[in-house]
């Protein structure tokens, strides 16, 4: 399949307050991620390289000890194996994450 409508894709809850619709090919995965106001994605790491762009809302993003407040249009790149954490502000947020290679645990 080459084309998708994200609104027709089932939503998967990754952790409480954080939901994603994922799409994948052979070597990369896209995730449209919606984060509830005040939600926190705790510090974690994975082997996958991750990049993304903020689509809506404000996030406090920490990568390898460096913290920035990100707004729509801001882009982040996280090398594999690097600690990162996300804290959502007073309103919901939405990001587009890109992973390589595909995160098998997010396929459904």
Segments the model singles out, each with a brief description of its role:
Residues 43, 61, 78, 84-89:
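Short beta-strand His + acidic residue motifs that chelate non-heme Fe in jelly-roll/DSBH
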Residues 81-105:
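Ligand-binding loop in jelly-roll beta-barrel domains
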Residues 48-59:
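Glycine- and acidic-residue-biased ligand/ion/polar-headgroup-sensing regions
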């Amino acid at each position: 399949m080459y084309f998708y409508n994200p609104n027709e894709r089932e939503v998967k809850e990754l952790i409480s307050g954080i939901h994603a619709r994922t799409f994948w090919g052979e070597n990369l995965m896209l995730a449209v991620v919606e984060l509830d106001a005040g939600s926190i994605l705790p510090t974690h790491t994975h082997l996958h390289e991750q990049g993304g762009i903020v689509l809506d809302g404000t996030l406090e993003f920490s990568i390898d000890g460096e913290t920035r407040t990100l707004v729509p249009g801001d882009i982040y790149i996280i090398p594999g194996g690097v600690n990162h954490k996300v804290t959502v502000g007073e309103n919901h947020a939405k990001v587009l994450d890109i992973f390589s290679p595909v995160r098998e645990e997010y396929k459904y």
